[in-house]
């Protein structure tokens, strides 16, 4: 069973690539044809590769993986935030701050500052400070929230990064490559697919296309996490059963001892 149907892909415009003069030759294997100066992506390959991406993401989620969704272009901002949040994961949908991954310790210090400012605003500290100082602190808090709010609670460097438009997010992709973090990405006809570990050939400019693919990745995480929960339940049940059997064995021994007495 496919993750999405051909009809869904067509309706979302996933097949529309870039103008033929703006292309990366390495994407040739994923191009079906060209029409009116626009490359048309081979959706048969998109379906197959999206299924592969779905299964990969689901497997990582089932092992308790942490995911970071990245998409800072205007068309991607809402979908990236909403789908990452729906899956209980993390996101960057504003400007990528250089070193977000490769200088994680520094980023964590800024996240700590964000949490401190939030606490100050909630516990009444701002109420007793001069208005000018409060204005400066509020501005600082809003800026940090804008850039770091999506990773504020991320416990560690992600196990997988999902990217909308890796050409635009080349710094994020490069940092992931340096750290060996697998990258799953929507790759359009104007983008070099080589830095991407799991390629999903797709229009990365249309809002509906971004929403569809991002949603599929969120669904994969949710399904994987459900599988993890089920596995944990089974393990707990088996552990409880083993403990109960041990208790029974002890009870039998006690009975034998009593009978000998």
UniProtKB/Swiss-Prot annotation:
Residues 224-261 are annotated as: Disordered. Keywords: Ribonucleoprotein, Ribosomal protein. GO terms for biological process: translation. PANTHER family: 30S RIBOSOMAL PROTEIN S2 PROKARYOTIC AND ORGANELLAR (PTHR12534), SMALL RIBOSOMAL SUBUNIT PROTEIN US2M (PTHR12534:SF0). It comes from the Bacteria. InterPro entries: Ribosomal_uS2, Ribosomal_uS2_bac/mit/plastid, Ribosomal_uS2_CS, Ribosomal_uS2_flav_dom_sf. The lineage of its organism: Bacteria, Bacillati, Bacillota, Bacilli, Lactobacillales. This is Small ribosomal subunit protein uS2. Pfam families: Ribosomal_S2 (PF00318). Residues 245-254 have a biased composition (Acidic residues). Belongs to the universal ribosomal protein uS2 family. The keyword Ribosomal protein applies. It comes from Lactobacillus gasseri (strain ATCC 33323 / DSM 20243 / BCRC 14619 / CIP 102991 / JCM 1131 / KCTC 3163 / NCIMB 11718 / NCTC 13722 / AM63).
